[in-house]
Amino acid sequence: MESLKRAWNQLVYTFSTEDRYAEYTPQGSTNVVGGEPFDTSNASRIQLNEFVDGAEVGGNDGVSECLLAWRHIDSWCSEHNPDLYATLSSPCTNNDIMWAEKDLAITFPAAVRASLRTHDGQEDVESMQGASGLIYGLKLMGLEEVVIMTRTWRNVAANLQRQMARMEQQQRAKSSSELPQTVTPQAVKQKGYGKVDNQDYHANPHLQKDISQNYNKQFKLDKLPKQGSIPPLAIQPVYAHPGWIPLVTDHAGNHIGVDLAPGPKGKYAQVILFGREFDTKFVVADNWGDFLLGFVNDLEKGNWLLVDNTDDYLNGEGDLVFVDHATRGPILNYLAVLKKRSWEKWQSTKPTQPLTSASVASFSTSSSVVNRPTPADAAGQARKTQGYSPMVPGASSNESVSFIPDSDVIMEESNLTQTDASSKGTTKPATPNPMTAPTVIRVSTPGSPSAAAEAPEPPKKATPPKAAKETKTPTVTKESTPASDANVDTELDSKNTETNEDTRATNTAHSMAPTVSSAITDLTAIDEPVATAGKPKDTEKTDDAKDVHEANKQDLTKANEAEAEENAVEPKDNEVSADSKVKARAESKSDHDSKTNNIPEKKVPQVTAKALPESDRGQASDAASTKSDKKAKPAEDPKEHDLKIEKLNEDFETVAL
């Protein structure tokens, strides 16, 4: 009867007690598990500042944030998704937390304790219709699930440690020549464990399993990928660790948990992402309270959406998913969102590293950044105009170098653009366009003889040679004449032709000084009335033309005398008397004058010439002679030509005697 009563009381206690880790006792004063009593008088209090073996407790960090976050979560769930609010479990007792800590040989952080004392995770959402995970589809695990999942991951970590130890032992055995090498036979092709004879089982106790085809290894990969963390050195670079306590799961082997064994640059009780898909672990919050408060901020910002993929009205409001309210983009996995935020936070706080020797070693020759030696006499000005770039460590002043930035080196785009512009300025100087470049002509005056020497020569590409010659000719302005004035133009051309012939005659008779000089004087006297004919009113312009003509004659005389000294003797038949030639020219011109007087009065075009300095008169005469040669000479009577030749021969003989 007593035993029946005790069994009944134990059954009632099992359904009514909140201490899930405590057993029933008839006295009711203590709850004993394994014979060790715990005081339950202060079970409603949250224990803080517990001792952690080998580490310092984080204190009460995150407790206030955790309590504030749970108030907002309860309010939001009851308003927007009552079915989700119904999945939240009742609080844990203090004894439950203590026995869980004893089983795991840890002490939960204060923020985790406060969370468990508010809600012991979620109920079995898979068995409840229309229920989903609280953290955007991720389930918040209860205390019992936390203990089970922690033990599972600890088994994984222990197996990894044993595998690594076995691999190290095999490497040492291979490197040691003293130990005998055991030979492992080929796998038996029959089902079940094969029989092995004459093998040393003491050297390899697992030999029977190794050679069997039915033995399934626990780890499929021969070598795990390299493990890392963001930020670096904040989490230990291992696949699994006994100090990682999972609190949230996606039912696929990935978790959000607290790290009780952080890396050198980590923080105790930091919230991390780890699991089968995270070879690189991420720190997402400093403590559990900050993580829950971040989740509440996403809810308050509107980064959520309830999705119902079924037509069943009993299915509830739908699943809670993450959608960015600012962009209204697609549905995102919350683990990926946390991963991205952790990366961006680390990048924003990452300091800019200075230029190191490792990054200097990555310099290679190219033309992106150009350093060229500058002349010693104009070093300062050359650095401003020739694209001078400051030298960098490890570079030479006589070679072109370019900097290839590493992943940890930041180069300013403005500096690169500036350097490219300077390098272009040094390699290809700007050349003026020959079609559009202006031509500047400076005429030296008698008062400034050095002006012509000081004038800069125009670029060869800017002005063609023909254009340069035309600019130095005396300016001659002619009025446009109608077709009826063609005869007058012919007469002017004949005059220019005669002037050119007179010049050549002077060159041939330069050795006859008195006669030739008198002939040139007579020729000038004859040309003057012809040049002034038809324009008696423009006396000033004709005077200027006379001066130019006389200056040209003087220059030609000097040049001819110099040539005469070089040519001592010339054939006698080719010498022509200047006096006879002058007389012949005078007769021909008189004939032209008589013909001109018989022509009815017509407007004669005015020919004006600007006075040029002495330095340019020779060039003007050469250009005039070249122009006159190009024009067609008038037809000459053969008889008159013979008479002219005879007169010139007679005059030459007279002068020679």
From Swiss-Prot:
Transmembrane segments: none annotated. Signal peptide: none annotated. Residues 492-504, 535-561, 569-604, 627-650 have a biased composition (Basic and acidic residues). InterPro entries: Knr4/Smi1, Knr4/Smi1-like_dom, Knr4/Smi1-like_sf, KNR4/SMI1_regulator. GO terms for biological process: fungal-type cell wall beta-glucan biosynthetic process; regulation of fungal-type cell wall biogenesis; regulation of mitotic cell cycle. Residues 168-193, 366-402, 416-657 are annotated as: Disordered. It comes from the Eukaryota. Residues 174-187, 416-436, 505-521 have a biased composition (Polar residues). Residues 444-455, 473-482 have a biased composition (Low complexity). One of its GO terms (cellular component) is cellular bud neck. Belongs to the KNR4/SMI1 family. This is KNR4/SMI1 homolog. It comes from Eremothecium gossypii (strain ATCC 10895 / CBS 109.51 / FGSC 9923 / NRRL Y-1056) (Yeast).
